[in-house]
């Protein structure tokens, strides 16, 4: 290890991590999980990568993943010729992320049959599920433009409001993007999937403000009223991003041999940042990130359309403004202080969220006094949170915090232990309208499959790396 591995956990979350390590050593984990080594070992392996600075960090929702554990944050010195970029440090769903849209509606406005009607309208308008085709027409020329320009393309085409990009991380566009570095196969997959939600843990939820912790910050975000209706969208770059990652991993195998990069886990395949392979992956990954922002923008367009259909009102009359949009899987060039010296770093965040503090130049003007909004999606049927970044987080975690609850059971374990009918019935009993393309897959996303999101949030709060603003409760869930 070149640097320490630091894990942010409380006692209960630590027990889960240690149990995972114990089970693996004893050979008792299910065959479905055998491709991934325990998260604790993964965090330690990342700490041995060339060019890493300060520490390999793991957020409270950490669990095992491909190469990097999910919840891992790692930064690499751009001025170090040995420093690397790793697709495993970003993930296959590049710029999987979350956005929150507020409204001026209240829970009373969406009671009873209206709630079901809204859920049905969202399900009808937003394509969901594995391999589903897009609801937004897209030519190859359109695709190249949006891969380069991000949300600006959606604004030009009428799928986003001009103001939306101001409330997106990076203003909804990575300037390091180059569509020419995205393979034909990746583009082919992306052409049919613009404006689609996908499956797995992706969702569109109607939520209501359940609790306000920071009145000032909530008011500035426009979500300060208990019972206020919001919409949360969670999805990413779909098949295009997956193909970009797959392509890069194949290329980097050869680059590692050429440059004599020695790894303790093959899933950490990487390339020197300054190498041709490293530069081209960064450019392709950035383009895939732009696709994800446009995808969430298009789904926002479809969600606004669905609400207008049900309430027979224009979406701006319902104050359907974007609160913020954050990435959960990304690598970005950022400025940070390390050992008292400002450095240009390539920060990998995999299953973690940027959380910049007040007065940071890269967050919107209207949030300068409170810090960057941080959107934390819960599990299906459980609460979500809005946080803000802190100065302590900027100093200790490269301005990063958690991204969700984090899996406690593998997908295979969930399918074995849980019954999908019971999961669906429990949601209905809790007053949550549910529309799902593949009912049998809901067990994989049941609350029992995940850690307690409240424990995760509270751990971040106590550590001081982010602060709670609002808790949101779901009243309708749309899934693949």
Curated annotation (Swiss-Prot):
<protein>
    <recommendedName>
        <fullName>RNA-splicing ligase RtcB homolog</fullName>
        <ecNumber>6.5.1.8</ecNumber>
    </recommendedName>
</protein>
<comment type="subunit">
    <text>Catalytic component of the tRNA-splicing ligase complex.</text>
</comment>
<feature type="binding site">
    <location>
        <begin position="377"/>
        <end position="380"/>
    </location>
    <ligand>
        <name>GMP</name>
    </ligand>
</feature>
<dbReference type="GO" id="GO:0046872">
    <property type="term" value="F:metal ion binding"/>
</dbReference>
<keyword id="KW-0464">Manganese</keyword>
<feature type="binding site">
    <location>
        <position position="202"/>
    </location>
    <ligand>
        <name>Mn(2+) 1</name>
    </ligand>
</feature>
<feature type="binding site">
    <location>
        <begin position="328"/>
        <end position="329"/>
    </location>
    <ligand>
        <name>GMP</name>
    </ligand>
</feature>
<keyword id="KW-0547">Nucleotide-binding</keyword>
<dbReference type="GO" id="GO:0006388">
    <property type="term" value="P:tRNA splicing, via endonucleolytic cleavage and ligation"/>
</dbReference>
<dbReference type="InterPro" id="IPR036025">
    <property type="entry name" value="RtcB-like_sf"/>
</dbReference>
<feature type="binding site">
    <location>
        <position position="328"/>
    </location>
    <ligand>
        <name>Mn(2+) 2</name>
    </ligand>
</feature>
<dbReference type="GO" id="GO:0072669">
    <property type="term" value="C:tRNA-splicing ligase complex"/>
</dbReference>
<keyword id="KW-0436">Ligase</keyword>
<feature type="binding site">
    <location>
        <position position="96"/>
    </location>
    <ligand>
        <name>Mn(2+) 2</name>
    </ligand>
</feature>
<feature type="active site" description="GMP-histidine intermediate">
    <location>
        <position position="403"/>
    </location>
</feature>
<feature type="binding site">
    <location>
        <position position="96"/>
    </location>
    <ligand>
        <name>Mn(2+) 1</name>
    </ligand>
</feature>
<keyword id="KW-0819">tRNA processing</keyword>
<dbReference type="GO" id="GO:0005634">
    <property type="term" value="C:nucleus"/>
</dbReference>
<keyword id="KW-0479">Metal-binding</keyword>
<comment type="function">
    <text>Catalytic subunit of the tRNA-splicing ligase complex that acts by directly joining spliced tRNA halves to mature-sized tRNAs by incorporating the precursor-derived splice junction phosphate into the mature tRNA as a canonical 3',5'-phosphodiester. May act as an RNA ligase with broad substrate specificity, and may function toward other RNAs.</text>
</comment>
<comment type="similarity">
    <text>Belongs to the RtcB family.</text>
</comment>
<dbReference type="InterPro" id="IPR001233">
    <property type="entry name" value="RtcB"/>
</dbReference>
<dbReference type="Pfam" id="PF01139">
    <property type="entry name" value="RtcB"/>
</dbReference>
<feature type="binding site">
    <location>
        <begin position="201"/>
        <end position="205"/>
    </location>
    <ligand>
        <name>GMP</name>
    </ligand>
</feature>
<dbReference type="GO" id="GO:0170057">
    <property type="term" value="F:RNA ligase (GTP) activity"/>
</dbReference>
<feature type="binding site">
    <location>
        <position position="479"/>
    </location>
    <ligand>
        <name>GMP</name>
    </ligand>
</feature>
<feature type="binding site">
    <location>
        <position position="384"/>
    </location>
    <ligand>
        <name>GMP</name>
    </ligand>
</feature>
<feature type="binding site">
    <location>
        <position position="93"/>
    </location>
    <ligand>
        <name>Mn(2+) 1</name>
    </ligand>
</feature>
<feature type="binding site">
    <location>
        <begin position="403"/>
        <end position="406"/>
    </location>
    <ligand>
        <name>GMP</name>
    </ligand>
</feature>
<dbReference type="GO" id="GO:0005525">
    <property type="term" value="F:GTP binding"/>
</dbReference>
<keyword id="KW-0342">GTP-binding</keyword>
<dbReference type="InterPro" id="IPR027513">
    <property type="entry name" value="RtcB_euk"/>
</dbReference>
<feature type="binding site">
    <location>
        <position position="234"/>
    </location>
    <ligand>
        <name>Mn(2+) 2</name>
    </ligand>
</feature>
């Amino acid at each position: 290890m070149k640097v320490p591995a630091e894990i942010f956990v409380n006692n209960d979350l630590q027990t889960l991590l240690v149990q995972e390590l114990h089970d693996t050593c004893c050979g008792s984990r299910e065959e479905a999980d055998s491709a991934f080594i325990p998260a604790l070992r993964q965090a330690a392996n990342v700490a041995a990568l060339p060019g890493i600075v300060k520490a390999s960090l793991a957020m409270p929702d950490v669990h095992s993943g491909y190469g990097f554990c999910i919840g891992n944050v790692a930064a690499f010195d751009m001025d170090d010729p040995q420093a690397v970029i790793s697709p495993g440090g970003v993930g296959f769903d590049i710029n999987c992320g979350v956005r929150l849209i507020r409204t001026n509606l209240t829970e009373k406005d969406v009671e009873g049959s209206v709630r079901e009607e809204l859920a049905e309208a969202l399900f009808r308008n937003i394509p969901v599920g594995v391999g589903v085709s897009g609801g937004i027409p897209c030519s190859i020329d359109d695709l190249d433009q949006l891969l380069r320009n991000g949300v600006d393309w959606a604004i030009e085409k009428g799928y986003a409001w001009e103001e939306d990009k101001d409330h997106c991380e990076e203003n909804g566009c990575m300037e390091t993007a180059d569509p020419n570095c995205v393979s034909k196969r990746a583009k082919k997959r992306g052409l049919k999937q613009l404006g689609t939600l996908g499956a797995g843990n992706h969702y569109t939820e109607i939520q209501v403000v359940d609790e306000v912790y920071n009145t000032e910050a909530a008011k500035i975000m426009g979500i300060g009223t208990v019972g206020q209706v919001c919409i949360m969208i969670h999805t990413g770059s779909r098949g295009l991003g997956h193909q970009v990652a797959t392509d890069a991993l194949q290329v980097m195998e050869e680059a590692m041999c050429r440059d004599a990069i020695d790894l303790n886990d093959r899933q950490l395949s990487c390339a020197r940042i300054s190498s041709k392979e490293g530069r081209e992956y960064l450019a392709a990954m950035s383009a895939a990130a732009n696709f994800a922002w446009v995808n969430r923008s298009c789904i926002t367009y479809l969600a606004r359309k669905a609400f207008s259909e049900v309430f027979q009102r224009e979406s701006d009359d319902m104050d359907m403004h974007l609160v913020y949009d954050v990435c959960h899987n990304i690598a970005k060039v950022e400025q940070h202080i390390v050992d008292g010296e400002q450095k240009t770093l390539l920060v990998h965040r995999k299953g973690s969220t940027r959380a910049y503090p007040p007065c940071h130049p890269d967050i919107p003007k209207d949030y300068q006094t409170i810090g960057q909004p941080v959107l934390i999606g819960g599990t299906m049927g459980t609460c979500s949170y809005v946080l803000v970044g802190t100065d302590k987080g900027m100093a200790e975690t490269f301005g990063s915090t958690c991204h969700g609850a984090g899996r406690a059971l593998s997908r295979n374990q969930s399918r074995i232990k849980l019954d999908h009918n019971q999961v669906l019935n429990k949601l209905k009993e809790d007053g949550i309208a549910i529309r799902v393309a593949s009912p049998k897959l809901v067990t994989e996303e049941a609350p029992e499959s995940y850690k307690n999101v409240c424990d995760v949030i509270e751990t971040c709060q106590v550590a001081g790396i982010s602060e709670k603003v609002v808790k949101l409760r779901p009243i309708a869930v749309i899934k693949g």
